[in-house]
Amino acid sequence: MFQGSMPALVTPMTNGAVDFEVLKRLVDWHVEEGSNGLVPVGTTGESPTLTHEEHEQVIETVVKAAGGRVPVIAGAGSNNTAEAMRHVQHAKDVGADATLVVTPYYNKPTQRGLIAHYEALAEVGIPIFIYNIPGRSVVDMTPETMGELAKHPMIIGVKDATADMARVSRQRETCGTDFVQMSAEDASALGFNAHGGVGCISVTANVAPKLCAEFQAAMGAGDYTEALAYQDRLMPLHNAIFTEPGLCGVKYAMSVLGLCSDEVRLPLVGVDESTKAAIEAALRHAGLLS
């Protein structure tokens, strides 16, 4: 159920407000283009600058628009366990298929604290993906800690943003081969799957969903020669999008293709002219812009 290419959805904005009509259109487009799932209100969905009400409205809108055609993994993390509990419960109540819960950031819990946090959330009764992103949260969940959490039937996988290929094999050892490992890094997704991953929660898939889905399908079929051809086609776009914060880059790329505006909320700002030029060149290289 959880595999392949899953866009880490942007949250479209118009004049400072979430544009729910555009969001619904994006959901339909992603399904039509072959995306294997949708992940709203993560980092790329501007979760830090959404109100609690907006957060819940975006999750509910995506679940309803998807209509069961693809699974929805709802962003539900917080560095406050009680707040995360509210998000996880809401995701369950509106019919999300799973939740994505980031390791608590800023307050730097110990590994024991991480275990207590996730075990408390797992009692809500909806599948949980751990989001391990030490570059943003500072704390790195160890494979051993993840293995302890994987014993809980509701903790089913990880979105891994470490870009450490050896980590995938180590987590297969500690968590078991059925534990669902999804890459959080577009540029290293090929290597991630080769080591035992089953997909990518992708930023680039916001603008190139068909290519990203075909890339993942090639790896799923064991055709890494074909997958490498897709990698070569997409790599300049991965790099250009992440020249500045990825959600800013991918929103600009989407605006070039007429999918949504490039508007982001402060403290983020739109990309500069040199980044715009690099993104446009990369879109041409990928065959997405003439």
Swiss-Prot record:
SUPFAM superfamilies: Aldolase
PROSITE patterns given in the database record: DHDPS_1 (PS00665), DHDPS_2 (PS00666)
GO cellular component annotations of the record: cytosol
Protein keywords: Amino-acid biosynthesis, Cytoplasm, Diaminopimelate biosynthesis, Lyase, Lysine biosynthesis, Schiff base
GO biological process: diaminopimelate biosynthetic process; lysine biosynthetic process via diaminopimelate
Pathway noted in the entry: Amino-acid biosynthesis; L-lysine biosynthesis via DAP pathway; (S)-tetrahydrodipicolinate from L-aspartate: step 3/4
UniProt-listed Enzyme Commission number(s): 4.3.3.7
Binding, pyruvate: 44, 201
InterPro entries in the record: Aldolase_TIM, DapA, DapA-like, Schiff_base-form_aldolases_AS, Schiff_base-form_aldolases_CS
Top-level enzyme category: lyase
PANTHER family in the cross-refs: 4-HYDROXY-2-OXOGLUTARATE ALDOLASE, MITOCHONDRIAL, DIHYDRODIPICOLINATE SYNTHASE
Protein family per UniProt: Belongs to the DapA family.
Protein name per the record: 4-hydroxy-tetrahydrodipicolinate synthase
Organism: Jannaschia sp. (strain CCS1)
